[in-house]
UniProtKB/Swiss-Prot annotation:
Function: This protein is involved in the repair of mismatches in DNA. It is required for dam-dependent methyl-directed DNA mismatch repair. May act as a 'molecular matchmaker', a protein that promotes the formation of a stable complex between two or more DNA-binding proteins in an ATP-dependent manner without itself being part of a final effector complex.
Gene designation: mutL
Entry GO MF terms: ATP binding; ATP hydrolysis activity; ATP-dependent DNA damage sensor activity; mismatched DNA binding
Classification via HAMAP family: DNA_mis_repair (MF_00149)
Keyword flag DNA damage: yes
Gene Ontology, cellular component aspect: mismatch repair complex
A Pfam cross-reference name: DNA_mis_repair
Protein name per the record: DNA mismatch repair protein MutL
Gene3D superfamilies: 3.30.230.10, Histidine kinase-like ATPase, C-terminal domain, MutL, C-terminal domain, dimerisation subdomain, MutL, C-terminal domain, regulatory subdomain
Length: 595
């Protein structure tokens, strides 16, 4: 077979295959061009989800007839000089989009330069240009793309339904709109207005907040912490959800690098790490986060669609993002989601008061800010005989409830819920969830500070497991478990002998503890990094620590728990994302008794 040069039209169609995957790709490229052109208003019109027609109009700087002639050629751009290749500030720079789109569609471009007398128009069919003509148009540019992929009909087979393709276009417009709150966006599909966003001309935080409300909704804002974090060459701003407001997928995580929407595994992992103490593995935070970084420290020329980036120092970026998120969350560490129970019971406070933790070290790098001073007014009492009857009203404590964020305990219901009174509300605490969170904080604190003390068993316990595999797994990890204050040895083929356990677990069921550890670790603990194994083991410890919570509590024990919640960050949710408390405002309760 003879080697030959490809024709210009074939080259453009190949390039289109890399850049233009679907109608949403066209929308993205044209809208980004409009933004680079200095637009303050962008209109998008679609027919059949963009398969039949895509129109993007803007009020940007426009083009002259000579610029229009050059713009539709491959590798032509006004946005990049050779010296700027590693200092890119614009969305477009490759000079491929218009030529690639024109190669697979019927394109009509009409443009008028600002303060020019005339507008000009050029038509392209399958990449073949026609003569530029004089036209009538307002300042700015309008690009019409008809019959997408008509020149490459095989690509049409890979398009999804109109509903799916339309959703992709809406998604990309929303992402771009989030990054540009000063620009107005209008999206129309089949004569129906689907998105109308008015540009704001206020300070950056107000602009961003209003745009997020317009695009995502105010529920997210009410359940989010504001991020404002700066270093000499890096800044992060945006909103990230409090731990109790989460979802089962990561689709509502909007990440931007220099206002460019991206999907980056490094940043997604950083999000997971920032929330690892508060969210289960199958739950995801919601966020709109903007990272501004020196363009010379990030390479956006990794993917033809510019959806991926490469950082000069990825570990630094990762650590900075984790610290920024943790700092933001610390400021709202005792807020529970406003949506909890709101659909089930209108009495649940929709705007809970922010309870800032007292005696808290708010450094984001620490595991927890729990205060373990021994001379506090209330301390954790030993688990012994409980004389207080369940549900029995507790005499008013000498301390006024006005002094405490969670008030003073008044009663316990069904050995599960604590009822406390504050100055203007009733707080209902799920004691099991609260103890679970408390246990997590204690264990993490003790691990970090080397205070996870071993307790030697008076009589070592022999635990027989269901298989040799499980026994071998535990024995192979005995050194790692020893660092977690659990001392074990092999005792026969399927048995383990336990001589020491963590003191914090108290009078724990050793048989059940070891069985649970074996069940959880046998499938994937081999060669597991110590840090990851620690997370697994801690969660098992917590379960056994909090088992003791479902019992009768004395007045002192209940108030002790409330005080410890006040002194603990992120006390609003347990480790399974359930709220530890809900608050009923007195004014809401009074509504029930009105005629």
């Amino acid at each position: 077979m003879t080697i030959k040069f490809l024709s210009e039209s074939t080259i453009n169609r190949i390039a289109a295959g890399e850049v233009i995957e679907r109608p949403a790709s066209v929308v993205k490229e044209l809208v980004e061009n409009a933004i680079d052109g200095g637009s303050t208003k962008i209109d998008i019109i679609l027919e059949r989800a963009g398969k039949n027609l895509i129109i993007v109009s803007d009020d940007g700087i426009g083009m002259t007839d000579k610029e229009l002639e050059i713009a539709v050629k491959r590798h032509t751009t006004s946005k990049l000089n050779e010296s700027d290749f590693f200092n890119i500030h614009t969305f477009g720079f490759r000079g491929e989009a218009l030529a690639s789109i024109a190669a697979i569609s019927k394109m009509l471009i009409t443009s008028k330069k600002r303060e020019a007398d005339k507008a000009f128009q050029i038509k392209l069919i399958g990449g073949n240009k026609q003569q530029i003509t004089v036209s009538v148009h307002n300042e700015g540019t309008k690009i019409e793309v008809r019959d997408l992929f008509f020149a490459t009909p095989a690509r049409l087979k890979f398009l999804r339904s109109d509903k799916t393709e339309l959703a992709a276009s809406i998604d990309i417009v929303k992402k771009i709109a989030l990054a540009h709150p000063r620009i107005s966006f209008n999206l129309i599909h089949d004569n129906k207005n689907l998105l109308k966003l008015k540009g704001q001309n206020k300070d950056s935080e107000t602009n961003l907040k209003q745009r997020i409300i317009d695009v995502i909704g105010d529920v997210f804002i009410k359940n989010a912490a504001y991020i404002d974090f700066k270093t000499p060459d890096f800044s992060i701003c945006g909103y990230t959800s409090i731990p109790t407001y989460n979802k089962a997928s990561s689709e509502d995580q909007f990440l931007f690098i220099n206002n460019r929407p991206i999907k980056d595994k490094l940043l997604q992992v950083a999000l997971r790490v920032a929330y690892q103490d508060y969210l289960a593995r199958d739950r995801y935070a919601l966020c709109v986060i903007f990272l501004q970084i020196d363009p010379q420290l990030v390479d956006v020329n990794v993917h033809p669609a510019k959806a991926e980036v490469r950082f000069h120092d990825p570990n630094y970026v990762r650590n900075i993002l984790i610290e920024a998120i943790k700092n933001a969350l610390t400021n709202k560490s005792q807020i529970t989601a406003t949506t909890i129970g709101s659909d089930k019971n209108s009495l649940v406070n929709k705007e809970p008061t922010i309870h800032k933790a007292t005696n808290v070290n708010s450094k984001a790098s620490e595991y927890t800010s729990f205060n373990f001073k021994r001379n506090t007014a209330y301390h954790t009492l030993p688990y012994g005989k409980i004389e207080q009857e369940v549900g029995k009203c507790i005499e008013h404590n000498n301390q006024s409830h006005k002094q405490y964020k969670f008030g003073v305990a008044k009663a316990q219901l069904h050995t599960t819920y604590i009822i406390s009174q504050t100055e203007d509300s009733i707080v209902i605490i799920d004691q099991h969830a609260a103890y679970e969170r408390l246990g997590y904080a204690k264990i993490k604190y003790c691990l970090k500070n080397g205070e996870l003390v071993k307790q030697r068993l008076l009589i070592p316990e022999i635990v027989e497991l269901s298989s040799q595999k499980k026994a071998d797994c535990l024995y192979e990890n005995r050194e790692k478990l020893f660092k977690l204050s659990l001392t074990i040895e092999k005792f026969g083929e399927k048995s383990i002998i336990v001589t020491e356990i963590p003191n914090i677990l108290g009078d724990v069921n050793v048989q059940k503890l070891i069985q649970d550890l074996a069940d959880h670790l046998s499938d994937f603990a081999k060669n597991m990094p110590l840090k990851e194994l620690i997370e697994h083991v801690i969660k098992i410890y917590i379960c056994h620590y909090s088992i003791r919570a479902a019992r009768k509590l004395s007045a002192d024990e209940m108030n002790s728990l409330l005080r410890q919640m006040e002194n603990m960050s992120f006390s609003a949710q347990c480790n399974n994302n359930r709220p530890t408390y809900i608050e009923l405002k007195l004014k809401d309760i009074e509504l029930l008794f009105r005629l």
